[in-house]
Design a protein with these regions (language model features):
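Glycine-rich oxoanion-binding loops at beta->alpha junctions
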Residues: 1-21, 70-121, 166-168, 172-189
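N-terminal phosphate-binding or glycine-rich loops at protein starts, especially the Walker A/P-loop
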Residues: 17-71
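Short glycine-rich or small-residue beta-strand-to-loop segments that form or flank ligand, phosphate
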Residues: 27-37, 93-98, 121-127, 202-207, ...
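Short, ordered loop/turn segments at secondary-structure junctions
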Residues: 33-35, 63-69, 99-100, 128-129, ...
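Short glycine/serine/threonine-rich phosphate/pyrophosphate-binding segments
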Residues: 37-47, 70-71, 103-109, 128-137, ...
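Accessory alpha-helical/coil subdomains and C-terminal extensions
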Residues: 125-127, 133-137, 141-142, 146-150, ...
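Phosphate-binding loop/pocket of nucleotide- and phosphate-handling active sites
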Residues: 468-485, 538-633
Length: 633
């Protein structure tokens, strides 16, 4: 298909042939594919309204439960009443969705047969990277039969972003992203209010995003969490000290590139310890769902296990997970691969080093890495307790720091003086014995590192001449010490499915309705193999431009089920983007490791009118400002 980017503009003086073609009666099919995203119903509404305006006798058919509806000839005609009932309404409940792929000759033939039964002029596929990939192949297959295929970019992950060869943005973000991010941000903001109230929990918030950290970045901008992780930052990390050391030794240290799990856990610990030192033993941590994929040793495991599982499934009648139902069964199979490789002296995907490192992981994490892949062969990060993996390492290291005396809760000087005065004790006599920074004017007092137990506390008091060997520790001093001992408590939260089903924001409502209109314009102008898009989303609505983007050039080779396949390339967070740089610049400010108030931001509820309707994603706004400054300079 000879495809180029289609610019959709009003026809000033259309000829009769164009008018006739535009307003002719059409049968159009539409299908949702993959996970739900807010705004899908407005795609249907926009397409329906545009189609009926052009020709009231045209029909729109919705395939039920995703691509299965196409294969099983399960559909319904979409009516005005149905459309009106679902306008601006979240989820994909009107026609449901599914994850089946039309990825074989037999399925393609069946899909074509069922589309021809309905006498379809066009098929619209609303979905993510895999679904739009499917749309490109279907467009090629259906072309000779005159059935057009148009894709619509849908995913709350925000990882469908398209630029032309000159770097100009054609599609800034997929629909559903803004609504999901705002839904998550609203909930996490409530947690910051809660944390600020009972001051005893660290809330660990895992945010959906299978690969890219776009949602995590947007949520961070919306709520200002104390600690947040961006997976792409970890992949780009270079340990210069390790590289220099290796150079001097005449070797290459490959572990210097990218962060290790241990390094990530230490970063989190550093923020927790710094906040505790100023009396804040609570906070908010935002972790993208797919963050582990950017950690070197985990990525290696995922790639190798994907290959092993795919190869097994291709050569055996029983699939891998049915053949090895328990964790021990799976581990035993991996051990056999290593043993056979040693005995036969052959290359194996899984080697002794892999097996040793894998066996060092907690059992629940091993289970997670060996979990069944989705229908596209993707590793299901939402099924892995990412936060449990990281926080387990964090808790282990915090125990070490606590025993070393480096993890303490800061004591307010006024509270200390009041507590001792109430007990009839002299604060200035005990202060230099208890605290390493007493009299320094510091906003919080820190108990000496040598005091890590009641026994060591008594030893310091005896050594400082405040009590005798046979005397008990005064109750007030005991109270001060216990207050300084950190109790690290966490509450885990996962934000994903709730955001997929939330009602769309004004931005997504408007975006998706116009995508529906764009779809019809592409169909009416005989386009196929195109993805409907809107340019200039970061600008005022009056500057939005509907376009069609050819899907085929957006694809690249990617490993799926152990084989290289052509799929739509997903966009990850650009660590040089203005939005990312803003977050990095404010990281220390958001940590709020001071005695002053925390820097949490409350985005407020989703609104459709008024001064603060939060009209578009903050990442889009900041990136546009950055580009504008570059252009001006």
């Amino acid at each position: 298909i000879d495809n180029v980017v289609q610019q959709i503009v009003p026809a000033d003086s259309p000829d009769e042939a164009f008018k006739k073609e535009y307003v002719k009666e059409r049968n159009i099919g539409i299908v949702f594919s993959g996970g739900p995203a807010p705004g899908g119903h407005n795609v249907i509404a926009g397409l329906f309204d545009a189609m009926k305006t052009a020709s009231p006798s045209s029909r729109l058919y919705g395939f039920i439960l995703g691509p299965d509806g196409i294969l099983e000839d399960d559909y319904m005609e979409i009516t005005q009443r149905m459309v009106d009932h679902h306008r601006n309404y979240g989820s994909f409940s009107m026609i449901k969705t599914g994850r089946t792929k039309i990825d074989s000759k037999a399925k393609m033939a069946l899909a074509l047969e069922n589309c021809k039964k309905l006498n379809l002029d066009a098929l619209v596929i609303v979905g993510g990277d895999d679904s739009n990939t499917n749309a490109a192949f279907l467009a090629q297959e259906f072309h000779k039969d005159g059935i057009q295929v148009i894709g619509v970019p849908k995913t709350i992950d925000g990882d469908i972003q398209v630029k032309d060869k000159n770097g100009n943005v054609l599609c800034a973000v997929s629909f559903g992203f803004h609504s999901a991010a705002r839904a998550f941000a609203s909930d996490i903001s409530n947690l910051s209010n809660d944390g600020n109230s009972d001051v005893k929990y660290w809330h660990i918030c895992k945010v959906m995003g299978r690969v890219a950290s776009h949602l995590g970045l947007e949520v961070a901008l919306q709520v200002h969490p104390n600690i947040f992780l961006i997976g792409e930052e970890m992949a780009d990390y270079i340990d210069s000290a390790r590289i220099e050391k290796a150079k001097k030794e005449g070797t290459v240290d490959y572990t210097a590139y990218g962060m290790t799990l241990r390094h990530v856990s230490r970063m989190i610990c550093d923020g927790i310890v710094r906040r505790a030192a100023v009396g804040k033993n609570y906070g908010i941590i935002v972790i993208p769902e797919g963050v582990l994929e950017f950690i070197n040793e985990i990525q290696v495991f995922i790639i190798k296990l994907n290959t092993i599982i795919a190869e097994y499934n291709q050569t055996h009648d029983l699939d891998f997970h049915s053949a090895f139902p328990t964790l021990e069964d799976k581990l035993d199979y991996l051990r056999r691969l290593v043993r056979l490789s040693r005995e036969d002296k052959t290359f194996s995907t899984w080697n002794t080093r892999d097996d040793d490192l894998f066996n060092d992981l907690p059992a629940f994490f091993q289970e997670g890495l060996l979990t069944e892949r989705d229908s596209h062969g993707n590793f299901q990060f939402s099924q892995v307790e990412t936060e449990k993996v990281l926080m387990g390492l964090v808790q282990d290291y915090l125990k070490i720091l606590k025993n070393r005396g480096d993890y303490k809760v800061g004591i307010k000087p006024d509270w200390y003086r009041k507590t001792l005065a109430k007990a009839g004790l002299n604060p200035d006599a005990f202060g230099p014995v208890l605290f390493k920074n007493y009299g320094s004017g510091a906003p919080c007092l820190l108990v000496k590192s040598s005091i890590v137990s009641n026994k060591t506390l008594k030893q310091e008091l005896v050594r400082g001449g405040q009590i005798g060997n046979t005397e008990d520790i005064p109750a007030a001093i005991q109270k001060v010490y216990q207050t300084s001992v950190p109790k690290f408590k966490t509450q885990n939260h996962f934000y994903g499915y709730d955001g997929r089903g939330s009602d769309p924001t004004w931005f997504d409502c408007t975006y998706t309705y116009n995508l529906g209109h764009t779809v019809f314009s592409l169909i009416a102008n005989k386009a196929t193999g195109q993805m409907a898009a809107i340019k200039n989303l970061e600008k005022d609505f009056s500057q939005w431009e509907p376009i069609g983007i050819p899907i085929a050039p957006l694809m690249h080779l990617e490993e799926r089920k152990g084989k290289l396949e052509l799929v739509l390339e997903r966009s990850i967070v650009d660590t040089n983007s203005p939005a990312y740089n803003v977050v990095k610049a404010l990281q220390n400010e958001w940590l709020s490791a001071t005695t002053g108030p925390d820097n949490y931001r409350n985005p407020g509820p989703i609104r459709f009118e008024g001064k603060n309707i939060n009209v578009r994603p903050l990442t889009l706004t900041l990136n546009n400002l950055g580009r504008s400054k570059l252009t001006d300079s």
